[in-house]
């Protein structure tokens, strides 16, 4: 990794007073745990979850969740740390994946996996009216047979097998735009972002 990328670059540009596009350092990289808390505060539905710091805590945490359970790193970008095996069907698989996440990232987020469609909606700050951020037409990720979520290989290695389509169902589009705007405002969002 480049030593001057991501949050470090944003912080440097802020310190130097340079203009840049995108989020400021307070909004640039919220943890998955922070996003779960904000989702609840914004009344945006999200899967049940638990954060664990030790493999010994997995069994207790898993009792509050329904399988399958998805294991993710505490921070998220580019599906790093998420593999096909991140979707766990039982406690044995869950402990194995959590051990890998904790070894690599220090903690692990466990969340109930919801079988279904996957969408993303882009949003940008509105300089004329901060209370009305601008949402863009949502898109749906369409997975090939045998795949049920976007993991690192699906996103970066086998991306040609996945397709993206605009959301044409007006009801779904409206819901996605409204939920994205609520999250952005609740998080005091700025610049631009996306909500999956």
How would you label these PLM feature ranges?
Residues 1-31, 45-48:
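A short, GP-enriched loop/loop-strand-helix hinge that lies immediately N-terminal to
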Residues 44, 103-106, 143, 185-189:
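Generic secondary-structure signature for well-ordered alpha-helical cores
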Residues 25-111, 115-117, 128:
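Active-site nucleotide/adenylate-binding loops and adjacent lid/helix of ATP-dependent enzymes
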Residues 90-178:
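Phosphate-binding site of ATP-dependent enzymes
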Residues 112, 123, 184-196:
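Conserved metal-phosphate-binding beta-hairpin within the catalytic cores
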Residues 59, 166-167, 174, 186-189:
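Peripheral (often C-terminal) accessory segments that flank ATP-dependent C-N-forming ligase machineries
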């Amino acid at each position: 990794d480049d030593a001057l990328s991501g949050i470090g670059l944003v912080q440097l540009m802020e310190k130097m007073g340079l203009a840049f596009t995108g989020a400021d350092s307070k909004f640039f990289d919220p943890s998955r745990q922070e996003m779960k808390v904000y989702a609840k505060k914004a009344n945006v539905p999200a899967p049940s979850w638990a954060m664990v710091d030790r493999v010994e805590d997995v069994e207790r945490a898993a009792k509050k969740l329904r399988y399958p359970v998805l294991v993710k790193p505490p921070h998220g970008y580019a599906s790093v740390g998420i593999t096909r095996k991140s979707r766990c069907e039982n406690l044995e698989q869950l402990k194995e994946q959590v051990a890998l996440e904790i070894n690599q990232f220090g903690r692990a987020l466990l969340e109930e996996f919801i079988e279904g469609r996957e969408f993303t909606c882009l949003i940008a700050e509105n300089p004329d009216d901060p209370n009305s951020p601008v949402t863009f037409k949502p898109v749906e990720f369409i997975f090939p047979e045998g795949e049920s979520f976007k993991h690192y290989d699906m996103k970066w290695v086998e991306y040609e097998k996945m397709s993206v389509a605009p959301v044409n169902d007006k009801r779904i589009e409206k819901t996605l735009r409204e939920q994205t705007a609520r999250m952005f405002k609740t998080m005091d969002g700025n610049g631009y972002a996306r909500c999956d």
